[in-house]
From Swiss-Prot:
Biological classification of the source: Bacteria, Bacillati, Bacillota, Bacilli, Bacillales
Function: May be the antitoxin component of a type II toxin-antitoxin (TA) system. Neutralizes the activity of cognate toxin YopC.
SUPFAM superfamilies attached to this UniProt entry: lambda repressor-like DNA-binding domains
Extent of the signal sequence: none
InterPro entries: Cro/C1-type_HTH (IPR001387), Lambda_DNA-bd_dom_sf (IPR010982)
Quaternary organization: Forms a complex with cognate toxin YopC.
Gene3D superfamilies in UniProt: lambda repressor-like DNA-binding domains
Protein name: Putative antitoxin YopB
GO molecular function per UniProt: DNA binding
Length: 75
């Protein structure tokens, strides 16, 4: 599972969702979804803007957690 770490990053830096969306010139509802970890798809331009603005790497913004669901790869 991939989850967003945006909430902890901007909360720690005391940056609001509204300020971030305004500063990176991206729609507030989309940034809010990333903040709340509600996104099903991650737009590349948004990821690029957020990482550049916050001066972070993509792996700091998006966290991969192994799922407990077993997937059978035997074919």
């Amino acid at each position: 599972m991939i989850r967003s770490n945006l909430k902890s990053i901007i909360d720690e830096r005391k940056i609001s969702i509204r300020k971030l969306s305004r500063d990176i010139d991206h729609e507030y509802p989309t940034v809010r979804k990333l903040y709340n970890d509600e996104m099903e798809r991650y737009p590349r331009d948004l990821l690029d803007k957020v990482c550049t603005y916050l001066n972070i790497e993509l792996q700091e913004l998006l966290i991969f957690e192994k799922s407990h669901n077993h997937i059978d790869h035997s074919g």
